[in-house]
Design a protein with these regions (language model features):
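Glutamine-centric residue-chemistry signal
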Residues: 148, 193, 247-249
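Single conserved hydrophobic/aromatic residue that forms the stacking wall/gate
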Residues: 239-250
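ATP-dependent adenylation/nucleotidyltransferase module used to activate substrates
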Residues: 1-153, 164, 174, 180
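Active-site and channel-lining beta-strand-loop segments
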Residues: 128-129, 216-230
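Active-site loop ensemble at the mouth of alpha/beta enzyme cores that anchors a bound cofactor
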Residues: 228-238
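Internal nucleotide-binding/catalytic subdomain
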Residues: 154-222
Length: 250
């Protein structure tokens, strides 16, 4: 079977490519360029960096599989970054990874797989697709510590037959062992937890740079007592805090 593997440059997607190749599949590696600097360059910090792309290229070379980098920066900016800024401007807290999976990654990967005559798209997510009552369902990974089904919940039923999550039954330590046994340079690479287009920077500065927040305000409790101030709703997340003697919302 010809399978398109989404390669991020991390150990998980590297092992997916290696496992599928070892099982005799015809594997094609693809990395999405989603975010770029002012001069069109890939970022140097966070995830989805130039170094990550280079790591993916080296893994593909080691495995002797074709490898491509595809530019989806326009789609990512329109669907993910704009949504991220807009939601914070409304006082909401977005999850950009969920929106990226919903409106960018899987649609484009499935479309690209079709163009390359691939039957499936495989990713390094920790989740499972299980057949139940003649239909496919998204389930949690066996290794719950790394389960990522929550960022995949938006996958529609028509997409599931076209997707494979080979790591759904494998633990993270096992993944690293497999990578080491295959001689992959990503075997002990650290996992990235950063928002790819924010990196190590403060997300509030990123949002402020893209929209004008000129109004500060008070933070009040349920009795309208002022308990603090804020510099704009984008700096706050909607939470509810309860204590024995007082309650407030932010």
């Amino acid at each position: 079977m010809r399978i398109l593997v989404a390669m991020s440059g991390g150990v998980d997607s590297s092992v997916v490519a290696g496992l599928l190749k070892s099982q005799g599949h015809d594997v094609i590696g693809v990395t999405m360029k989603l975010w770029e600097g002012p001069n069109g360059e890939m970022p140097e910090t966070g995830c989805c960096t130039a170094a990550d792309s280079e790591d993916a290229r080296k893994v593909a070379a080691k495995l002797d599989i074709p490898y491509y980098v595809l530019d989806y920066t326009a789609s990512f900016s329109e669907n993910v970054i704009n949504n991220f800024v807009d939601m914070y401007s409304q006082g909401l807290t977005p999850n950009p990874c969920v929106e990226c999976n919903r409106s960018v990654k899987f649609d484009h990967f499935i479309d690209q797989a079709k163009k390359l005559n691939c039957e499936k798209v495989a990713t390094g997510h920790y989740a499972k697709i299980v057949r139940s009552n003649n239909s496919l369902e998204l389930h949690k990974a066996d290794y719950l510590e790394k389960d990522q089904s929550y960022v995949l919940h938006m996958l529609t039923a028509d997409k599931l037959p076209k997707i494979d999550f080979p790591l759904g039954t494998i633990s993270k330590p096992e993944v690293r062992q497999i990578a080491a046994s295959l001689g992959l340079k990503t075997a002990f690479k650290k996992d990235s937890q950063d928002i790819c287009f924010v990196g190590k920077k403060d997300y509030r500065n990123f949002v402020s740079s893209r929209i004008d927040f000129s109004s500060s305000g008070d933070i009040v409790d349920k009795d309208d007592n002022i308990i603090g101030t804020h510099e704009g709703v984008h700096e706050l997340s909607l939470i509810h805090i309860s204590e024995p003697t007082r309650q407030w919302q932010i």
